[in-house]
Amino acid sequence: MNYSTENVSSAALRKRKTLKKSINFSIMIIGESGSGRSTLINTLCGGNSIVPTSSTATQDPFTKKLTLRHENVELEDNEGHKISLNIIDTPNFANSINCDDDFKIIVDFIRHQFDEVLLEESRVKRNPRFKDGRIHVLIYMINPTGHGLSDIDVKFLQHVNNLVNIIPIISKADSLTPKELKLNKELILEDLNNYGINFYKFNEYDYEQDYIDEEIIEYNKYLNSLIPFAIIGANEYRSNPNGSEDEDDILKLRILNKDFKPIDIDNAEINDFTILKNVLLVTHLNEFKDITHDSIYENYRTEALSGKQFQYVNKDSAKQEISESDYLMKEEQIKLEEERLRKFEERVHQDLINKRKELLERENELKEIEKRLLAEGLKFDENGDVVKVHEEESSENEVKVI
């Protein structure tokens, strides 16, 4: 194979190198049992990688505790860009009478990911294999009750408010009539605004940029009009009868069995799933990541380094207090250490000068004493005692001293 510059340009090499790197993207999906979380995950990933918890339940669901289930799926778009999609599922969410423990587990997990990044940033020598586990999007599934948010919905969303990009969706939207769905969306939006819940609003982040694309603005206005997204998941996949392996054809054949009648869930007229998937994995993926790092994490980091006591969450969700000094920037610590060492060296150097000066003064004093003793016919013996000397010895010593 010829690898000359005529066949392989530097731009092509850079593109190949870029395509080899996967984009790390993390989504947490929250919903009560039976809300269709597993179905949504399987539809999002294009396969049955998740077994619904309801199908494996053998005990009273109210005795089960919340667990965080992690799934990783490698996806690739038409241009060859790879996405390492990390999905955190939440089986048994809100199964207990008191849901505070469930809220705490999820909030602790989200905060822990921030703490891990904060600790990594504070290290002088960073880990090149460090994996960023921050949650970029939290999809909250709302049951299709025909009403607004439930008390559990409100309390949980208030717990995670300002900690993550929240996207509310109505699950199993096909159980509502178009009129009921429209009313349900209006009531949910009203509750979100009344309770001060900051759900994700499309394009607010982009408006801060110098360049504004009118087409993008219109598209984002359209997306905002769909919130909360109405989703219908798929529990069965059928191959294309024409034998085509084209992904677009396969997508159109995803169906949901409802009263034994198949529903094409990729039809945007009755289902927002295709739009939601495109938002998550194509059009707004980088925006979710940027907001998570530049806005949400920076606010958390500022609070953590502001001098206030806060809670560091370890992997076991046990908490321990950490003060500001534990998060001092390493550069500041190094400067303080260098200053301390410099002062210590100066003190040692000055002590040596003083000792040398004292020794010289003592030596001169001894010489003067010795001269006076010799003049009087005396001297120091080996024990340091003063004794008389013979006259000739005294003369010789006087000559030596002179």
UniProtKB/Swiss-Prot annotation:
UniProt modification remark: Hyphal induction causes immediate phosphorylation at Ser-395 by GIN4 and at Ser-394 by CDC28-CCN1. GIN4 phosphorylation at Ser-395 primes CDC11 for further phosphorylation by CDC28-CCN1. CDC28-HGC1 then maintains CDC11 phosphorylation throughout hyphal growth. Ser-4 is also phosphorylated in yeast cells but not hyphal cells. Met-1 is acetylated.
Domain Septin-type G: 21-307
Database matches in Gene3D superfamilies: P-loop containing nucleotide triphosphate hydrolases
Region feature (G4 motif): 171-174
Protein name per UniProt: Septin CDC11
Protein family (similarity comment): Belongs to the TRAFAC class TrmE-Era-EngA-EngB-Septin-like GTPase superfamily. Septin GTPase family.
Superkingdom of origin: Eukaryota
GO cellular component: a single term: meiotic spindle
Source organism (scientific name): Candida albicans (strain SC5314 / ATCC MYA-2876) (Yeast)
Residues bound to GTP: 31-38, 172-180, 233
Disruption phenotype: Causes greater curvature of cells growing in a filamentous manner and morphological defects in suspensor cells and chlamydospores. Leads to reduced tissue penetration and non-invasive fungal masses in mice infected kidneys. Also leads to hypersusceptibility to caspofungin.
